[in-house]
């Protein structure tokens, strides 16, 4: 007769969880940030709001974003005028879009990750799906399982309405699943479509306007597992530790509420200040056990909530400008894609490291950090170890 301890030991993986593949996707419709204010005020029938349009132009200019991808085309918006209004009942129309398109966009990213991984999809044991774009039953995890043709026995976990920190959450969860289930291969998918938050401008709700200047659509997928088969699988990053915390005195700093008018977005002015004030504490807690105190010795993957957050974090920690290069690149090319952003940055970092001939996947460095920030204010901190190129 075996003991529970023996069974437990046999169930666990030996080594740390590793990211084995990354895939990303966006809708085809690309919007240029420099011309977006004209388009946005025209499509929402708001051109009479001249001063507000000038304000929005300045927001877009300061955003450090060159372009974004959006499922909502001019044609779709013309067919759904309530989505273009500031506060018109429109949840049904938004839901009809996202419950179909969120899993579809996730499928494109997942297929790329599975292709890079190079193993049959029947080996996927777990699915973790995250979106802040709409809710449904059965969820986007179920729809993706069907779209990809995964095994009906795949163990699914669906996270709705977590917001911008959730790219860190899905990695933390997948790490625990991979390390506690021998042979587990976890497909992680974040898929975000701004059809839930798009709305016309209003003088009374400038934080909503900030969202209209920043948010873009995108999906990203990872394959995560422990003890990679050296003949068949190629690790990209090892996941060393993962933590979540709620920042003190930050209640109400970022809120979202699902209403008849869609998902409303509320933002306090001092979000960058709150994050930069507390970020060093999170870093110390994560890296003290490793004896690391030089934040410039790390490679950095930070959720690009907006340029002000990145600027204040950089200043507070005295980071060299190149530390947030991959993060700023993704913000510039895609905008803020909520939970998917940090996965896009991981992809950008390993590709740029390879292209530049650096000797690790983390810009030639050994240790790195991944930060997710979002409603709460909630912060996810993941310690990464790069892999030799």
Curated annotation (Swiss-Prot):
Gene Ontology BP term (one): polyketide biosynthetic process
Catalyzed reaction equations: (E)-4-coumaroyl-CoA + 3 malonyl-CoA + 3 H(+) = 2',4,4',6'-tetrahydroxychalcone + 3 CO2 + 4 CoA
Protein name: Chalcone synthase E
Domain of life: Eukaryota
Family: Belongs to the thiolase-like superfamily. Chalcone/stilbene synthases family.
Active site: 164
EC primary class: transferase
Record function comment: The primary product of this enzyme is 4,2',4',6'-tetrahydroxychalcone (also termed naringenin-chalcone or chalcone) which can under specific conditions spontaneously isomerize into naringenin.
Taxonomic source organism: Ipomoea nil
């Amino acid at each position: 007769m075996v003991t529970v301890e023996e069974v437990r030991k046999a169930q666990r993986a030996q080594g740390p969880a590793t990211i084995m593949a990354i895939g990303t996707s966006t809708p085809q419709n690309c919007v240029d940030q420099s011309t977006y204010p004209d388009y946005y005020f025209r499509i929402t029938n708001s051109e009479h709001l001249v001063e507000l349009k000038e304000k929005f132009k300045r927001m877009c200019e300061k955003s450090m974003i060159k372009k974004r991808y959006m499922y909502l085309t001019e044609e779709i918006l013309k067919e759904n005028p309530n989505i273009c209004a500031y506060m018109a009942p429109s949840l049904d129309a938004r839901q009809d879009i996202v419950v179909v398109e969120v899993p579809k966009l996730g499928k494109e990213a997942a297929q790329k990750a599975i292709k890079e991984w190079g193993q049959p999809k029947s080996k996927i044991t777990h699915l973790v799906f995250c979106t802040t774009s709409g809710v449904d039953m059965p969820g986007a995890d179920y729809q993706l399982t069907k779209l990809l043709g995964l095994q009906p026995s795949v163990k699914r976990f669906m996270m709705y309405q977590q917001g911008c920190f959730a790219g860190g959450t899905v990695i933390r969860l997948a790490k625990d699943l991979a390390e506690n289930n021998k042979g587990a291969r976890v497909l992680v998918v974040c898929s975000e479509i701004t059809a839930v938050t798009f709305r016309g401008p209003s003088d009374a709700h400038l934080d909503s306007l900030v969202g209209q200047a920043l948010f873009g659509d995108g999906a990203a997928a990872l394959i995560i597992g422990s003890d990679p088969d050296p003949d068949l699988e190629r690790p990209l990053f090892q996941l060393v530790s993962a933590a979540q915390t709620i920042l003190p005195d930050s209640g109400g700093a970022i809120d979202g509420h699902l209403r008849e008018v869609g998902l409303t977005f509320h933002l306090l002015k001092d979000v960058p200040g709150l994050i930069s004030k507390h970020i060093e504490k999170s870093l110390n807690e994560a890296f003290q056990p490793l004896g690391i105190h030089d934040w410039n010795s790390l490679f950095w993957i930070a959720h690009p909530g907006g340029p002000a957050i990145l600027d204040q974090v950089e200043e507070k920690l005295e980071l060299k400008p190149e530390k947030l290069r991959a993060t700023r690149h993704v913000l510039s090319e895609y905008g803020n894609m909520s939970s998917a952003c940090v996965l896009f940055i991981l992809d950008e970092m390993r590709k740029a490291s390879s292209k530049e001939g650096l000797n690790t996947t983390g810009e030639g460095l050994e240790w790195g950090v991944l930060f997710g920030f979002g409603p709460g204010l909630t912060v996810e901190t993941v310690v990464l170890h790069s892999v030799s190129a």
